[in-house]
């Protein structure tokens, strides 16, 4: 039976698991599917319980979005903007609940989770403002007495399938862009981080009309049922290449699709670079969120003149990072890894690189005293060979390989050598090198002398195996719109 009563009206103790229920028509619904238990990766405590939505339950959520779409599409942009601002404000009041849910389910330190929640709220406010900036144009005709109008209209009900590494922020990218454009949405959060979505659903129920935003829980089968539903006009997905390829095969040929699939991101450091700044940037972007971010620096190519200084500095910085339970030590630098699979893959990549001749100069294994939590020391591998897994596969853990280079063109070629093309970084103080790197690095996002490859008001997307389509900026909003050409005859017939 549906229930309109919020499940978590007040903040809950950290030890109480969040109970998640499918959400559509602004009400919570029980599921007949087997429950999913999500445990805190730092200590094994039960963090949340969520349903495995059946195909029929998923279809009901899609029907809710479909039925709400005509009215939401007709709403004036200023009204959609106002309601999105209200949703952002409601989520801000629940920011501590959201951050706590993130840390309990995902493992990142609480202060970092608070930052993620703040970025989610910022994304909603940004798209609330963009809602009133959807413009058309008039087109002159060669025939007298005719005028063409080009309008942009929302696609329809869309699906947002989000991963576990940034379980709140990435919902904001999809929910914000879709609803600002006039689409309704069904969100499927990761089965590893369902509790975050439960808190968000309570904010949605308090602010938005029924059916505009809906949530279904489950694993890959739920995502496939959602993506393959004939009433879904577009699927926006962030996650692994393997799942992205499966979705590509699942969706109808006429269903829109955007894929953000990560990839092995490089950094290039030249002899002219500010080495201290490059070390600080590599430390942050390699180990933040325990390396579980699509734009993490996986591999660094350092010109030989500064190679030793950079590698020593990065090793020292990595060893100085605090690794701890993110609830017990909110300001820790690195928390628990989210999944055992990621934990094991990181160790495998370290072992592989060492077997091929790399040297561990920082970290290298589990953190003493924190078992059975999924904690690894931030690890730096010096002189990592090109054939080591860490230098071409995405580790998605607290690990970075470093290799020297002599010629900048060779470094750019090596940086471009991995299959993905989401983000790349460079540090140099030479103007010619800056432009050579900015133009030569074949990635959707390139950051020079900084490691913030994405900002909210500029397009964010990848190339090659990192996917296609854009989020953020006007381009992110435009991805939920379609063109309509209206040709008017206004002259005498």
Model region roles, listed by residue range:
Residues 37, 51, 73-74, 106, ...:
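A structural signal for short, well-ordered beta-strand elements
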Residues 26, 44, 80, 102, ...:
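Residue-level signal for inorganic ion chemistry
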Residues 43-49, 232, 268, 368, ...:
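Conserved C-terminal structural/oligomerization subdomain of aldehyde/semialdehyde dehydrogenase
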Residues 2-146, 338:
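N-terminal Rossmann-like NAD(P)+-binding subdomain of aldehyde/semialdehyde dehydrogenases
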Residues 242-385, 448:
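ALDH superfamily catalytic-core signature
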Residues 41, 55-58, 77, 95, ...:
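Residues at or immediately preceding the N-termini of alpha-helices
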Residues 136-277, 405:
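Rossmann-like NAD(P) dinucleotide-binding subdomain of oxidoreductase/dehydrogenase enzymes
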Residues 69, 73, 88-95, 99, ...:
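Structural signal for hydrophobic packing residues in well-ordered secondary-structure cores
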């Amino acid at each position: 039976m549906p229930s309109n009563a919020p499940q978590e009206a007040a903040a809950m103790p950290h030890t109480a698991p969040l109970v998640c229920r499918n959400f559509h028509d602004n009400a919570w619904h029980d599921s007949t599917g087997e429950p999913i238990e999500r445990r805190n990766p730092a200590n094994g405590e039960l963090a949340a319980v969520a349903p495995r939505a059946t195909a029929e339950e998923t279809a009901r959520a899609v029907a809710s979005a479909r039925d709400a779409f005509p009215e939401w599409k007709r709403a004036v942009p200023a009204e959609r903007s106002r309601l999105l601002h209200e949703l952002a404000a409601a989520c801000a009041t629940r920011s501590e609940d959201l951050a706590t849910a993130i840390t309990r389910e995902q493992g990142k330190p609480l202060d970092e989770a608070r930052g993620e929640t703040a970025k989610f709220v910022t994304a909603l406010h940004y798209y609330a403002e963009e809602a009133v900036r959807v413009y058309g144009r008039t087109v002159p005709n060669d025939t007298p007495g005719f005028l063409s109008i080009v309008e942009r209209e929302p696609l329809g009900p869309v699906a947002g399938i989000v991963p576990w590494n940034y379980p709140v922020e990435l919902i904001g990218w999809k929910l914000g862009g879709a609803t600002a454009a006039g689409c309704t949405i069904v969100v499927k959060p990761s089965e590893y981080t369902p509790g975050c979505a439960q808190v968000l659903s309570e904010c949605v129920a308090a602010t938005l009309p029924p059916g505009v935003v809906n949530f279904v829980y489950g694993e890959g089968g739920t995502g496939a049922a959602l993506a393959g539903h004939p009433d879904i006009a577009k699927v926006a997905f962030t996650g692994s290449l393997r799942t992205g390829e499966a979705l590509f095969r699942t969706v109808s040929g006429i269903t829109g699709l955007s894929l953000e699939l990560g990839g092995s991101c490089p950094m290039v450091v030249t002899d002219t670079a500010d080495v201290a700044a490059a070390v600080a940037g590599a430390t942050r972007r390699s180990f933040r969120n325990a390396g579980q971010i699509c734009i993490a620096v996986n591999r660094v190519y350092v010109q030989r003149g500064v190679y030793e200084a950079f590698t020593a500095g990065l090793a020292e910085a990595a060893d100085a990072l605090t690794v701890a339970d993110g609830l017990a030590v909110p300001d820790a630098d690195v928390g628990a890894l989210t999944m055992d699979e990621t934990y094991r893959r990181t160790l495998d990549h370290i072992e592989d690189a060492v077997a091929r001749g790399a040297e561990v100069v920082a970290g290298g294994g589990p953190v003493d005293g924190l078992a059975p939590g999924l904690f690894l020391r931030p690890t730096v591998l010096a002189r990592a060979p090109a054939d080591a897994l860490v230098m071409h596969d995405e580790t998605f853990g607290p690990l970075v390989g470093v290799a020297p280079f002599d010629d900048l063109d060779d470094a750019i070629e090596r940086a471009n050598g991995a299959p993905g093309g989401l983000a790349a970084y460079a540090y140099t103080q030479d103007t010619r090198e800056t432009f050579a790197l900015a133009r030569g690095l074949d990635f959707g996002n390139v950051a020079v002398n900084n490691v913030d490859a994405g900002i909210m008001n500029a397009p964010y997307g990848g190339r090659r195996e990192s996917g296609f389509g854009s989020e953020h900026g006007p381009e992110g909003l435009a991805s939920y719109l379609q063109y309509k050409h209206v040709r008017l005859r206004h002259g005498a017939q």
